[in-house]
Design a protein with these regions (language model features):
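Extended, charged alpha-beta segments that form solvent-exposed binding/catalytic grooves
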Residues: 1-186
């Protein structure tokens, strides 16, 4: 499974990155609320206040900050690694688990194409894993616009969204007719 995920991330141009599992607590708690403090495993080693990482994003931010002038942007990275939560275990929530993370970091505004690329990556991974039928639900018109941009359909964006909004209210035949009206078939 890990190989499938890594190979797919690489196929989309993501660079592998590994960050430390143990971090200074001050780094993990910087700009965080009280909820984060409840989530981390914290311990002292000598005079050092240390914690196990609770996600892969904070260590990534530290990495980018330390190497900002050395990186090429947009910086596309992936990491698959263990993270640890100090919260009480409950159904579907574990104290130690693997997180598969991909991020695109820019030094300015990023194209929506990067957001639109994420569901494509998920689709490719799930398909390669042969998990059977699945549905990817997207609740962002900005991301949807990225898909249309990728398909060279930006000019029909508003028309397509109006049709999508009617999907559950009209028959499949009516839906096809509406798509034909804006010259979208297949």
């Amino acid at each position: 499974i890990k190989t499938i995920i890594e190979d797919t991330y690489k196929l989309y141009g993501f660079y592998p990155l590994d960050t430390p599992i143990i971090e200074y607590s001050s780094v993990l708690l910087a700009k965080a609320g009280g909820e984060t403090e409840k989530q981390i495993y914290r311990f002292n080693k000598g005079d050092n206040d240390l914690s196990l990482r609770f996600d892969l994003t904070v260590p990534l931010a530290k990495y980018v900050s330390a190497r900002y002038n050395e990186l090429s942007f947009p910086f596309k990275r992936y990491q698959i690694g263990k993270v640890f939560r100090g919260e009480r275990p409950q159904k579907g929530r574990f104290r130690e688990f693997y997180q598969c993370d991909i991020d695109v970091i820019g030094d300015g505004e990023l194209s929506l194409m990067y957001d639109a690329e994420i569901p494509s990556i998920i689709y490719d991974i799930f398909t390669k894993m042969n998990i059977g039928k699945f549905v990817i639900r997207i609740n962002s018109r900005k991301i949807l616009n990225g898909f249309f941009e990728n398909l060279n359909l930006s000019d029909k964006y508003q028309d397509i969204l109006r049709i999508i909004d009617k999907m559950e209210k009209v028959s499949e035949e009516d839906l096809i007719d509406m798509l034909k009206e804006i010259n979208l078939t297949n």
